[in-house]
C-alpha cells in the first residue's frame, strides 16, 4: 500500500507558486446553501482570501493562511501544523498537492469535523488516491451544473473555466457511501 506521504517543503513552495487558482466567491456561497459549519473554520490555502472573505461575511471566524504570501492571511506551511485543528476546514488546495492537503487535514481534525475541498471532478480518478477514499470515505459531493470559475493566478480575463469543479466533503469518522448533489 502506498504511504500517505508529504512532499518536501521547497518543492511545495515552488509548485504552489505556479499552482494558484483563486476561487470565485459564488462557489463558496453555493456551498453555504447546502452545508452548515462550526463557528471556527481553518482555510489553509487561502490565496487572495476569496473563500475566507465569504465565510467572514457570513459570520464565521476564519483562520486563513497560505504557504505563499499572496497578500491575505498570514504565511504558514499547512504541513507544519501538528496540533489538532479547531473547527471545520474549507479549502481550494493546490491541485498538485490536493491529496496531501486532504490527508493532513483529516489526520489533525476532530471526529465529526467537516472538510470541504474545491477540486476538479477528475480527483475521483487515479489509483494513487484509492487509499485516500478507502481510509476516508467521502460524505457528499456537490457538482456544479454550470462551471464554477477558478482563476489561474487570479487572472479573471481568461474567462470561464472549461473544467468541472466540485465541492468534495468529508466528515471525519464517516463510514458509508457518498451522496452526489448538483448545484444550480
Question: How would you label these PLM feature ranges?
Answer:
Residues 1-184:
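Class I S-adenosyl-L-methionine-dependent methyltransferase catalytic core
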Amino acid at each position: 500500500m502506498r504511504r500517505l506521504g508529504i512532499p518536501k517543503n521547497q518543492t511545495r513552495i515552488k509548485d504552489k507558486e505556479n499552482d494558484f487558482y483563486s476561487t470565485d466567491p459564488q462557489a463558496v456561497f453555493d456551498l453555504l446553501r447546502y452545508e452548515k459549519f462550526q463557528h471556527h473554520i481553518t482555510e489553509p490555502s487561502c490565496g487572495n482570501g476569496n473563500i475566507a472573505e465569504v465565510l467572514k461575511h457570513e459570520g464565521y471566524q476564519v483562520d486563513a493562511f497560505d504557504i505563499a504570501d499572496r497578500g491575505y492571511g498570514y504565511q504558514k506551511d499547512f504541513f507544519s501544523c501538528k496540533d489538532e485543528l479547531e473547527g471545520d476546514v474549507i479549502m481550494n488546495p493546490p491541485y498538485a498537492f490536493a491529496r496531501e492537503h486532504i490527508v493532513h487535514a483529516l489526520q489533525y481534525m476532530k471526529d465529526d469535523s467537516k472538510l470541504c475541498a474545491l477540486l476538479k471532478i477528475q480527483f475521483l480518478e487515479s489509483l494513487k488516491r484509492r487509499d485516500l477514499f478507502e481510509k476516508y470515505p467521502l460524505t457528499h459531493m456537490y457538482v456544479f451544473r454550470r462551471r464554477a470559475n477558478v482563476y489561474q493566478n487570479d487572472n479573471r480575463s481568461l474567462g470561464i473555466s472549461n473544467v468541472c469543479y466540485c465541492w468534495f466533503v468529508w466528515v471525519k469518522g464517516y463510514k458509508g457511501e457518498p451522496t452526489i448533489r448538483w448545484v444550480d
